[in-house]
Design a protein with these regions (language model features):
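ATP/NTP phosphate-donor binding region
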Residues: 1-73, 248, 268
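Accessory alpha-helical/coil subdomains and C-terminal extensions
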Residues: 7-8, 29, 36-37, 156-239
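A glycine- and small-aliphatic-rich helix-loop capping segment at beta-alpha/alpha-beta transitions
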Residues: 20-28, 91, 97-109, 125-131, ...
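Short acidic, glycine-rich surface-loop motifs adjacent to enzyme active sites
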Residues: 80-92, 228-239
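Short Gly/Thr/Asp-enriched flexible loops that form oxyanion-binding sites at enzyme active sites
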Residues: 85-106, 242-250
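Internal gly/pro-rich beta-alpha loop/helix module
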Residues: 111-182
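Catalytic cores of soluble, metal-dependent hydrolases
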Residues: 215-294
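Conserved small/polar residues in nucleotide/adenosyl-binding loops
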Residues: 296-303
Length: 304
């Protein structure tokens, strides 16, 4: 039987309604999370490690980096054949992407969470944990990279995003769809995710600003990053185009040596060198701006 280590970080999956406020608050330990999953021991030898217990909006790039180092360190031992990371859904895609970008291990790593708290009617956490454990324990998951599993769908960490604020069926790959499914008796993959270049580093930069463009935008916000941000992600319009006044500010900071990545605010599709007017993706590339291609804005920020 495969040994799966469940590493808990917090999020809605580990929350219950607070009697005084009526809102969800962190309340469930990692071990209690696993204990709430019926039949878990039938699929893997599961151990639990609590990394943190906080809302995912409180996760930082430093937290993600420490988590990645923990996974790689444990993967070099015989303590686990695979890993499940429980995480709040607000920033789950960012942590999953970060792990995919930096992890050295080829052992399965599956990230999951919940849209309903542990005390809510029809809480989805236990079923998602079970599906994620089965995914991490499957031999088919080896070499597939970091995956995200909720609602029995398996997604590639590089491409998945949250598309609804409250609906449990909230995660999607808007480009290609899911890569696999957890069925009653098996885990089945329909395609192999595209391999991307890994980033191996001993440090990361946290002071990255994300600025979204809009019609008629001036460069005030962009200029405000000077001396404060170590890098910028510009969330352009269309296939990666930038309004004229914003363009001027972006090029000013680029000339000052700031690394800048251009993405798009459009939910699906790629940054493309479609046009050649000033402010187009092509012109920005020619001025030293990095094109984000298919990266979501938050993913580009995590590629730090």
């Amino acid at each position: 039987m495969k040994k799966i280590l469940v590493i808990t970080t917090g999020g809605t999956i580990a929350m219950k309604k607070d009697r005084e406020t009526g809102g969800l608050m962190p309340a469930v330990s990692g071990k209690d999370l696993a204990a709430a999953v019926p039949g878990l021991a039938h699929y893997a030898d599961v151990d639990v490690l609590e990394f943190s217990n906080k809302p995912s909006g409180w996760m930082t790039a430093a937290d993600m980096f420490e988590l990645s180092k923990l996974i790689d360190r444990l993967a070099d031992t015989d303590q686990a054949d695979g890993f499940v990371i429980t995480h709040g859904t607000d920033t789950l895609e960012e942590t999953a992407f970060f792990l995919e970008a930096v992890l050295k291990t080829e052992k399965p790593v599956c990230v999951t969470g919940a849209m309903r708290g542990a005390s809510d009617l029809s809480a989805d956490g236990p079923a998602n944990i079970l599906a994620a454990v089965r995914t991490a324990a499957s031999g088919e998951s080896i070499g597939k990279g970091v995956t995200v599993c909720l609602g029995d769908r398996i997604y590639a960490a590089w491409d998945v995003t949250k598309v609804h604020t409250t609906n449990p069926d909230t995660f999607r790959d808007l480009h290609y769809g899911s890569i696999g499914t957890v069925y009653g008796s098996r885990v089945e993959y329909g395609r192999i995710p595209v391999k991307h270049k890994k980033i191996h580093t001993d440090r990361i930069e946290e002071d990255i600003w994300i600025i979204t463009c809009w019609s008629g935008m001036d460069g005030g916000i962009v200029y405000g990053a000077e001396g404060k941000a170590a890098g910028l992600v510009i969330d352009g319009i269309g296939c990666g185009n930038v309004p004229p006044k914003c363009r001027k500010a972006v090029l000013y900071l680029r000339e000052k040596g700031m690394p800048i990545v251009l993405t798009t605010r459009v939910p699906s599709g790629s940054v493309e060198e479609e046009y050649s007017y000033e402010g187009s993706a092509l012109s920005m590339k020619d001025s030293g701006i990095i094109l984000g291609c298919l990266l979501y804005t938050s993913d580009a920020a995590d590629d730090r």
